[in-house]
């Protein structure tokens, strides 16, 4: 927790305020459920969910001064749909989405809007760690109604919208950016 406090102290010292905090932490052990160990669970939950709670607290302390701010987390469709080898990450991202709702309610009186963006499969370096990478890519291309895979820009556009004044009354929501893929599951 000290590193989190140090990070936000540095933001405060440099800028004196915080308008938007993007929580894009993501890591996890990709194995079948029966092969998971306690250390895998703890590692993934700490990075993906626990960090949001404590970083969100520190971000909110800075945002309260201006009585405004946006906290936006990145999630994954694995939070609502089964993905092979994705147990720890999927469950941790479900925790991120739940925590998003709790933060949204408790931070609303301070003018802070909290939301999340959940993405479909994106071909990034992280995808190379999936043991079933090729099957995931094939599925994403062939079964996405929009006819193409999601790109990082698709997620960025959703985050930019949530960070804008146009989204001030959106609170505690997870915006799904998947080209319609989860509609077919």
Language-model segments: which ranges?
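Substrate-binding pocket helix/loop in short-chain dehydrogenase/reductase
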Residues: 4, 32-33, 40-43, 137-140
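Short, small/polar-rich loop/turn modules that mediate ligand/substrate recognition or access, typified
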Residues: 17, 108, 113, 170-172
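Active-site loop-to-helix junction immediately N-terminal to the catalytic Tyr of the SDR YXXXK motif
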Residues: 36, 82-90, 102
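Active-site helix of classical SDR
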Residues: 56, 92, 100
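Alpha-helical segment proximal to the catalytic Tyr-Lys
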Residues: 61, 105-109, 168
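Residue(s) in the substrate-gating loop at a strand-loop-helix junction
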Residues: 76
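Short C-terminal tail/terminal secondary-structure segment
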Residues: 81, 160, 171-185
């Amino acid at each position: 927790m000290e590193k989190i406090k140090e990070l936000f102290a540095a933001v405060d010292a440099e800028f004196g305020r915080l308008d938007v905090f993007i929580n894009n932490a993501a890591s996890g052990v990709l194995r079948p459920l029966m092969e998971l160990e306690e250390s895998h669970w703890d590692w993934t939950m700490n990075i993906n969910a626990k960090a949001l709670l404590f970083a969100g607290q520190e971000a909110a302390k800075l945002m309260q001064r201006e009585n405004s701010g946006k906290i936006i987390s990145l999630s994954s469709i694995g939070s609502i749909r089964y993905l092979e080898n994705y147990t720890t990450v999927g469950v941790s991202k479900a925790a991120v989405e739940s925590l998003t709702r709790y933060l949204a309610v408790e931070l609303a009186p301070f003018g802070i809007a909290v939301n999340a963006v959940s993405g479909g499969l994106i071909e990034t370096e992280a995808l190379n760690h999936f043991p079933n990478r090729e099957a995931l890519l094939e599925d994403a291309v062939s079964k996405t109604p929009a006819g193409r895979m999601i790109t990082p820009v698709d997620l960025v556009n959703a985050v930019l919208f949530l960070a804008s004044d146009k989204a001030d009354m959106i609170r505690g929501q997870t915006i799904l950016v998947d080209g319609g893929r989860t509609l077919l599951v």
